[in-house]
UniProtKB/Swiss-Prot annotation:
UniProt GO MF annotations: tRNA (guanine(37)-N1)-methyltransferase activity
Protein name: tRNA (guanine-N(1)-)-methyltransferase
Known partners and oligomeric status: Homodimer.
Homology family: Belongs to the RNA methyltransferase TrmD family.
GO biological process: tRNA N1-guanine methylation
Sites where the protein binds S-adenosyl-L-methionine: G113, V133, G134, D135, F136, I137, V138
Cited function: Specifically methylates guanosine-37 in various tRNAs.
């Protein structure tokens, strides 16, 4: 798995290779990672990457030429055109299922927009998919890109150190995760459910599934409804 990130602020991505699961996976060479600054592919002495939008309006837009040249450079280095993802408020929602789908691409290039966005011609001709991390606006695509990368890295075999860790995460089966407890067994008058202490694995799994259903129904009724519809459809077949 290789990630190439087009960004005006490459220093922001050092967090991925310096801490947590993504750092360990990087050190274990489970994925490759490189940042590309489109200013490198400008032709003027000011290294201009943005300009005013035609038709007027506030803000500036990232220009087509530097972005296209950056993708071309990535293509030359990788040896094939990567799957290009633009982090955009207009994109499809980033979900656990979407992360799994993206795993099918060995080379993923993430485009981090700034200002008021990027020239539509780049989106139409170069971008393969637009992805949104939520219905809110942030200053650029860097944080959304890091969220997407972290989510994908967790799915790489060996990244978490325990094969079932990713499988038990929230959303992996369409449900929220169940409650978890650790030592001490008693704290501030609160205990741990007896079923988790008895060591009966079948009962523990049943309890966890029931708790996942209950928690999803209470906290995310939209997911709960979708889960029921999916499993009812499967049973009908």
């Amino acid at each position: 798995m290789r990630f190439d990130v087009i960004t005006l602020f490459p220093e922001m991505f050092s967090a991925l290779t310096e801490s947590g699961v993504s750092r360990r996976a990087y050190q274990d060479q489970l994925y490759q990672f490189k940042t590309w600054n489109p200013r490198t592919y400008t032709t003027d002495r000011h290294k201009t990457v943005d300009d005013r939008p035609y038709g007027g309006g506030p803000g500036m837009l990232m220009m087509y030429p530097p972005l296209k040249k950056t993708v071309d450079a990535i293509t030359d280095e990788v040896g094939e055109k990567p799957y290009v993802v633009y982090l955009s408020p207009q994109g499809r929602p980033l979900t656990q299922q979407k992360l799994s789908e993206l795993q099918s691409h060995s080379n993923v290039t993430l485009v981090c927009g700034r200002y008021e966005g990027i020239d539509e011609r780049f989106i139409e001709t170069v971008v393969d998919e637009e992805i949104c991390v939520g219905d809110f606006i942030v200053s650029g695509g860097e944080l959304p890109a890091m969220m997407l990368m972290d989510g994908m890295i967790r799915l790489i075999p060996g990244a978490l150190g325990h094969n079932q860790s990713a499988e038990q995460d929230s959303f992996s089966d369409g449900l929220l995760d169940c409650p978890h407890y650790t030592r001490p067994v008693e704290v501030d008058g609160m205990g741990v459910p007896e079923v988790l202490q008895e060591g009966h694995h079948a009962k523990i799994e049943q309890w966890r599934h029931e708790q996942k259903l209950l928690r999803t129904k209470q906290k995310r009724p939209d997911l709960y409804t979708a889960y029921l519809a999916k499993h009812t459809e499967t049973q009908d077949k």
